[in-house]
C-alpha cells in the first residue's frame, strides 16, 4: 500500500512547501506525480477556504493509494477540539460538494463524494 500523508500547511512559506513535500514522500511514477500534483492543488485551495470559513479548522491532509485513484482518495479536515468539530459537522456535505466540484474541474470524477472528505480530530501522524 502506497500511502501519502503530508503535513505541509497553508501557513508554511511558499518556497518551503516543495522541499517539505519532497522529504516526506516516496518515489512516484510520472502518472502518480501528476495525480499527486492535482490532489495537492485542490487540497491547498480547499484548506485556504476552510481556514477562513470554519472556526477551529487547523489542517487539511489526505490519504491515497495511487493504483486505486481516484476511488481511494480521502481528504481530512483536522480540527482543534471536539467542540469545533461538532460545530462544523453540519457543513460537511457542503465541503464534500466543493471537493467533488474542484476535482471535476481538474477532470477527475468522484463517484460518491461522501466517501472522499471527512472531519476529524486526528492528525496525519495519529
Task: Please identify what each model-predicted range represents.
Residues 79-85:
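Short beta-strand-loop-alpha-helix junction that forms the active-site gateway
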Residues 100-126:
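A short amphipathic beta-strand at an alpha->beta junction
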Residues 55-78:
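Short edge beta-strands and adjacent turn/loop segments
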Residues 35-50, 85-110:
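Short, non-transmembrane amphipathic alpha-helical segments
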Residues 4-24:
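Short, Lys/Arg-enriched N-terminal segments with co-localized hydrophobic residues
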Residues 19-45:
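N-terminal presequence-like segments and adjacent domain-start helices
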Amino acid at each position: 500500500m502506497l500511502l501519502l500523508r503530508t503535513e505541509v500547511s497553508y501557513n508554511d512559506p511558499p518556497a518551503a512547501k516543495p522541499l517539505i513535500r519532497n522529504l516526506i514522500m516516496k518515489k512516484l511514477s510520472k502518472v502518480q506525480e501528476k495525480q499527486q500534483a492535482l490532489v495537492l492543488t485542490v487540497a491547498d485551495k480547499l484548506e485556504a477556504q476552510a481556514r477562513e470559513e470554519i472556526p477551529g479548522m487547523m489542517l487539511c491532509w489526505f490519504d491515497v493509494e495511487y493504483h486505486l485513484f481516484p476511488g481511494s482518495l480521502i481528504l481530512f479536515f483536522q480540527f482543534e477540539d471536539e467542540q469545533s468539530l461538532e460545530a462544523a459537522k453540519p457543513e460537511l456535505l457542503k465541503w464534500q460538494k466543493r471537493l467533488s466540484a474542484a476535482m471535476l474541474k481538474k477532470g477527475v470524477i468522484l463517484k460518491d463524494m461522501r466517501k472522499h472528505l471527512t472531519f476529524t480530530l486526528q492528525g496525519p501522524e495519529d
